[in-house]
Regions:
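Positively charged, small/polar-rich N-terminal and surface patches that mediate targeting and assembly
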Residues: 403-407, 421-578
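Glycine- and aromatic-enriched membrane alpha-helices
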Residues: 1-454
Length: 578
């Protein structure tokens, strides 16, 4: 093997590894979109992401690749079916698989913005159309030797070619589809509909961040001939923009919402990655940091604008992340471009390059927006007026997992878990309660006393039921504390609910949360021998922290208790007769 063959093998290997990383972005998108939507639609989201790639792969091979990389004209590549006449004529199989995973990325962006109310069949049709025609045509303009490429338009890894295409399609689709039931009040105020798992969303964000090194770094398609230097710079600028955008969004939401918003900050990471994708090879680390800051502002105010002003319901923020930041990142190259490969070529306005290059970038963005917006409007309206784009109201309320896929739940045997106190044995924590000072009356956990007529049992002993609502994490220590005063029988239920609290409003992705139902623990005990006052005092000591959410205690008079096995009633029914 000579040096040339070795270099070719290294370049191909590098590109194939990058293609595998880009493929794994599908898992990241699936996790982000699933986590940011409700559990009753989780299976449907997963299927849509799976079909984006599974339908897109053969469609892009049969039709899309020829349109994108054919040489028929500057506007349209040509109909080279099954990549025939394209692979082998300046392109190879490595390019085919690399562009296939890029095409799937553009397609999958739309599923999140149209989540929870789109027919699965309609979505499959959309996915095939964007993979066959929409993405390949604009891709030909940019990467296939088309008219934008001839003008000098620069989009290294796809801020416009991939992300903005998907983002514009997402905006058009969500607008035509309409908002989810309950998203907006009658006066048009946006309501927050929180996703069911920010943990899944965060996992997806980290997967995407990791895979983006292949998405951007692999776009060098070579390590030889200076490619290694460019790839190294791409890694640095990609990571820098994402990190700075994340911090920027955290700070903005901390100021605007009084707390750093988790879901919006996760979107901030993705926004930084999208924005830097076009110019990661030509900007300096300083330029990438500034782009990250711009992306942070754009995603927060962009998501709020789409949600609250345009009244377009985008459950995962795909429009703000991909459409707005795809366009922004592409245009900002005109300001910050400094390199051309391994050479310094300051084309950016801030480096004295003038406005010509900036104008080309703006022209390219506008042209692609127009192409995607017009064609996707036609596609979605055809689907809407033929097979239908949206599920029925009943199906939407039920959740799409059951009516679309026959899936009762994406989470088998799902139910809330009652955790123990982290890092502490229940007995140890209960022992500490004995040394706790009495709780001041004005700071105590609220106690409600409910009385009824004829509440004494037939034997004259007073019976009382104590109902405790508290955090699930308090279960073990509360159980141990009650056992310590002789209360061993109890009924425990996992519940969800909320209390009426005064204070600062809560926000989710910029929209105020009206009511948040939180997982709680409901513990019920009936006592007679143990004084109610003792039970209440112990419960107060266990639950009190001084913060909202400590819980509540309800005390009821009980008319009678009957033990079914023995027939014992009242006080005797509560005693251990073993």
């Amino acid at each position: 093997m000579d040096i040339l063959d070795l270099a070719t093998s290294v370049d191909v290997g590098w590109t194939l590894v990058a293609a595998a990383l880009v493929f794994f972005m599908q898992a990241g998108f699936a996790m982000v979109e699933t986590g940011f939507t409700r559990a009753k639609n989780a299976g449907n989201i997963i299927m849509k992401n799976l079909m984006d790639f599974s339908l897109g792969t053969p469609i892009f091979w049969i039709l899309g690749f020829g349109i994108m990389f054919g040489a028929a004209s500057p506007f349209f590549g040509g109909f080279d079916f099954f990549a025939d006449g394209v692979v082998g004529e300046g392109y190879d199989w490595t390019t085919l698989i690399f562009q296939t995973v890029f095409c799937a990325t553009a397609a999958t962006i739309v599923s999140g913005s149209m989540a929870e109310r789109t027919k699965f069949s309609a979505y499959c049709i959309y996915s095939m159309v964007i993979s066959a025609v929409i993405y390949p045509v604009s891709g030909h303009w940019i990467w296939g030797g088309g008219w934008l490429a001839e003008l000098g338009f620069h989009d290294f890894a796809g801020s416009t070619a991939v992300h903005m295409v998907g983002g514009v399609a997402a905006l058009v689709g969500a607008a035509i589809l309409g908002p989810r039931i309950g998203k907006y009040t009658k006066d048009g105020k946006a309501r927050a509909i929180p996703g069911h798992s920010l943990t899944l969303g965060a996992l997806g964000c980290f997967i995407l961040w990791f895979c983006w090194f292949g998405f951007n770094g692999g776009s060098t398609v070579a390590l030889s001939g200076g490619g290694a230097e460019v790839a190294s710079r791409v890694f640095v600028t990609t990571n820098m923009a994402a990190a700075v955008a994340t911090v920027t969004v955290m700070c903005i939401t901390w100021i605007r919402y009084k707390k750093p918003d988790v879901s919006m900050t996760l979107n901030g990471s993705l926004a930084g990655l999208v924005a830097i994708t076009a110019g990661c090879d030509v900007v300096t680390p300083v330029g990438s940091a500034i782009i990250g800051i711009c992306a942070g502002f754009a995603v927060v105010f962009g998501i709020e604008f789409v949600d609250q002003k345009l009244k377009v319901d985008d459950p995962v923020g795909a429009v703000g992340v991909h459409c707005i930041n795809g366009a922004l990142g592409t245009i900002l190259i005109g300001l910050f471009a400094y390199y051309n490969g391994t050479e310094v070529e300051p084309l950016g306005v801030f480096y004295g390059g003038g406005f010509h290059f900036l104008g080309i970038q703006i022209l390219g963005v506008v042209a692609v927006i127009a192409w995607v917006a017009i064609t996707m409007t036609i596609v979605f309206n055809i689907i809407k007026h033929t097979i239908g784009l949206r599920v029925s109201e009943a199906e939407e309320i039920m959740g799409l997992d059951k009516p679309e896929h026959g899936l009762s739940s994406a989470y088998a045997d799902f139910m809330p878990v009652v955790p123990t106190v982290l890092g502490t044995k229940a007995g140890e924590t209960a022992a500490k309660i004995k040394d706790t000072a009495p709780v001041a009356v004005e700071k105590a956990v609220p106690v409600t006393k409910v009385t009824t007529e004829g509440s004494a049992a037939a034997d004259g002993h007073k019976l009382s039921k104590v109902v405790i609502i508290t955090k699930q994490s308090k279960f073990e220590v509360l159980k141990e504390a009650l056992a310590g005063i002789g209360v061993s029988g109890m009924t425990v239920t996992n519940v969800i609910g909320c209390g009426v609290q005064k204070g600062a409003a809560e926000y989710y992705r910029g929209a105020e949360v009206d009511v948040t139902l939180l997982p709680k623990l409901k513990m019920e005990v009936v006592v007679s021998k143990v004084p109610v006052e003792t039970v209440v005092e112990v419960v107060k000591k266990v639950l009190y922290t001084g913060h909202i959410g400590d819980g509540k205690i309800f005390v009821y008079d009980v008319e009678n208790v009957i033990k079914v096995r023995t027939g014992a009633e009242g006080f005797d029914a509560l005693q251990d007769d073993e």
